[in-house]
Amino acid sequence: CLISAFVKVQGKSSSTPIIYIDGNGVMRWSDTRREASFFGVNYTLPFAHAYRAIGYLELDRKAAIDKDVYHISRLGLNAYRIHLWDVELTDGQGNLLENEHLDLMDYLIAKLKERNIHIVITAQTNFGNGYPERNIQTGGFSYKYDKCDMHSHPEAIAAQETYLHGLVKHVNPYTGLAYKDDPSIVGFEINNEPCHSGTKKEVKAYINRMLKAINKTGNRKPVFYNVSHNGYVVEAYYETAIQGTTYQWYPIGLVSGQTQQGNFLPYIDRYDIPFSDKVKGFDKKTRMVYEFDPADIMYSYMYPAMVRTFRTAGFQWITQFAYDPMDIAYANTEYQTHFLNLAYTPHKAISMKIAAEAARSLKRGESYGSYPQDTLFGDGFRVSYTEDLSE
């Protein structure tokens, strides 16, 4: 495991703390060996609808990023995750394109880095860039294959190897660092919500090929994989050298088409992982929530309670999906089922700020009982449906 990192910045060598994963699957800081805890958001402005919508308004995308990163920082968040739209970053063979999407991603990373916000990059989505509009053809390799063929078609696998290798070693001109060498980038998730259709042997072989492509760059950062999809091959995930496993949670559903009403605290009492006591090596890989959200509600009482439950289940990285860019948040056109922005949903945003404090202070693995007893937890945290309150 990594113990330290030596990073050259502006001609000076300095030792910068990084994240490593120990033999028990725990993320730790290299300088203190203390456990790490990250809480933050997904945010998509460099890509897809958010990118286009800022263009429709004829606004400066980098200025928009500046405002949003400032607000994200004000909320006390220290984590950022994104699934890159590979269709906007690649050609048909998986070669990384030097285009505006990559430039904006590089710029965003640099701005997050300035505010000590750490990053996990999910390298590919393997789906289109349209939602909620129509897909726009780009020539990217993922448009050539069905998502459920991406992990078995020989040419698709070869394109992914090319892409992952190019992405991980890409040098960010705003930081002067390759992604693989930037201490602010905690690690890489191979893909977003994979759709496997092969045998356990084939799935394991696919993951090992992706790991080889990444590691050939000299990467020593942790690599994560989604284990909450394709449960029939879950053992294969744990038989590979991935160091982190990823999960999501939408406890009250998605895309209801209306604002939901009611007390949803009983829905989030527990986060059960059905194979936690069945799969060999489960406790040897760190656990990350790549996406979560109590969707389609405007209440302010849910976020700290969800963090409480995630910490009980052993998660060290928790990122909500998704933070709305301020310049388009007034219309909530990006993901209508999700709505979070400091200026336009201030009560939910403050709940996120309180949740960030909970993520930092609550001990991993500690239980707080069941509802309603668990509405009081940690050192003075409280949530209430009747008061619509987080504190």
Located regions from the model:
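Flexible loop/turn segments at secondary-structure boundaries
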Residues: L89, N129, Y232-V233, G253-L254, ...
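Well-ordered, non-membrane alpha-helical segments in soluble/globular domains
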Residues: I65, K204-R209, F264-I273, S300-A305
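Substrate-binding cleft of secreted/luminal carbohydrate-active enzymes
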Residues: D296-T375
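Bacterial Sec-dependent N-terminal signal peptides
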Residues: C1-K12
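Short, flexible/disordered intra-domain loops and linkers
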Residues: A53-E58, G94-L96, K200, V255-F264, ...
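Active-site mouth of glycoside hydrolases
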Residues: T16-I242
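Extended non-globular C-terminal regions
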Residues: S390-E391
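Glycoside hydrolase catalytic-domain groove-lining segments
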Residues: V223-F224, Y232-D296
